[in-house]
């Protein structure tokens, strides 16, 4: 988990932010929460629960109210808002920035930004960026590919053929996100997202060949930066004694950051086309999400067949 994000990183990701004051402090100021403060009560002088460590975002309401205050009161208010813990001030909608805010920010070495975006939209963009940056993170050994728009994480023991299978899937028109190591973070209560570490982005290791650049070989359409992990495929070496699920009734899940992700175990055996099997597994999972379950259809057909045979047996016994 990233403990804090530099304000300079926020500026790079939200291009609508224009620096007005404190450019030299961008790398010094840190943001440790995705919550954003809209200092309304503070403008009236009420600071009992002022969240000083949050980004201070002022929109039309805050700026118009501050304009009604006299100079001395406005100066006192902005001096109290500007603390060493405050990451930055942002004024939306391209509104004029009070000179008292600029002076207070300069004293405490706080960057001040202006943006033409609407306040609510700007708040949403910043929150989304900070949620991703500050989210809990961990690395998983595996390969992440996007199959028909669905993120599929392929895991298994080293040497089982994860990268080779992913390469076959890329050749079939699907997209690589990460090979060997997948960095995973929790986006919300029901969503986990995977991406590649910067050093491994768009690269794959194929035994006997070495490192290959997937984007260079197959084009930009063969790669993607990140995707939601919706299905996990666990590759296992074939064990004749193992009892593999043949009908699809036993649905299993794997927990990632308290999010249960469906998992399918695929036994690896010479002659099995793993790429096609995984492709079909992804399509079958999507069909289940849309309400069609082939295993339930089979069970229904079997029940009807047994019922029909029972009726025939009853009819023959009466004769």
Curated annotation (Swiss-Prot):
Cofactor: Mg(2+)
Catalytic activity, reaction form: [HPr protein]-L-serine + ATP = [HPr protein]-O-phospho-L-serine + ADP + H(+); [HPr protein]-O-phospho-L-serine + phosphate + H(+) = [HPr protein]-L-serine + diphosphate
Chain residues that bind Mg(2+): 163, 205
Xref: InterPro entries: HPr(Ser)_kin/Pase (IPR003755), Hpr_kin/Pase_C (IPR011104), Hpr_kin/Pase_Hpr_N (IPR011126), P-loop_NTPase (IPR027417), Ser_kin/Pase_Hpr-like_N_sf (IPR028979)
Binding site for ATP: 156-163
Subunit structure: Homohexamer.
Function summary: Catalyzes the ATP- as well as the pyrophosphate-dependent phosphorylation of a specific serine residue in HPr, a phosphocarrier protein of the phosphoenolpyruvate-dependent sugar phosphotransferase system (PTS). HprK/P also catalyzes the pyrophosphate-producing, inorganic phosphate-dependent dephosphorylation (phosphorolysis) of seryl-phosphorylated HPr (P-Ser-HPr).
HAMAP family: HPr_kinase
Protein's name in the database: HPr kinase/phosphorylase
Top-level taxonomy: Bacteria, Bacillati, Bacillota, Bacilli, Lactobacillales
């Amino acid at each position: 988990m990233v403990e804090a994000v530099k304000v300079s990183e926020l500026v790079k990701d939200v291009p609508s932010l224009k620096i007005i004051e404190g450019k030299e402090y961008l790398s010094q100021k840190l943001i440790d929460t995705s919550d954003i403060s809209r200092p309304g009560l503070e403008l009236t002088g009420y600071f009992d629960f002022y969240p000083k460590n949050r980004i201070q975002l002022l929109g039309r309401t805050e700026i118009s109210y501050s304009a009604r205050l006299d100079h001395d009161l406005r100066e006192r208010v902005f001096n109290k808002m500007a603390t060493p813990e405050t990451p930055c001030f942002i004024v939306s909608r391209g509104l004029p920035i009070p000179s008292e805010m600029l002076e207070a920010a300069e004293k405490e070495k706080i960057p001040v930004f202006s943006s033409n975006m609407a306040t609510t939209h700007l708040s949403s963009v910043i929150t989304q960026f900070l949620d991703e940056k500050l989210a809990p993170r961990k690395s998983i050994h595996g390969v992440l590919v996007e199959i028909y728009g669905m993120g599929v994480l392929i895991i298994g023991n080293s040497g089982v053929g994860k990268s080779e299978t992913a390469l076959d899937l890329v050749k079939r028109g699907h997209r690589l996100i990460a090979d060997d190591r997948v960095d995973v973070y929790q986006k919300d209560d029901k969503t986990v997202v995977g991406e590649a570490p910067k050093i491994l982005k768009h690269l794959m290791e194929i035994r006997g060949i070495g490192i290959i650049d997937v984007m260079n070989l197959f084009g930009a359409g063969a790669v993607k930066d990140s995707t939601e992990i919706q299905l996990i495929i666990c590759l296992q070496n074939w064990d004749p004694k193992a009892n593999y699920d043949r009908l699809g009734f036993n649905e299993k899940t794997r927990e990632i950051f308290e999010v249960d992700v469906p998992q399918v175990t695929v036994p690896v055996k010479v002659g099995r086309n793993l790429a096609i099997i995984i492709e079909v597994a992804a399509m079958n999972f999507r069909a289940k999400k849309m309400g069609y379950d082939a295993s339930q259809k089979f069970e229904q057909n079997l029940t009807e067949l047994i019922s029909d045979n029972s009726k025939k047996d009853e009819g023959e016994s009466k004769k």
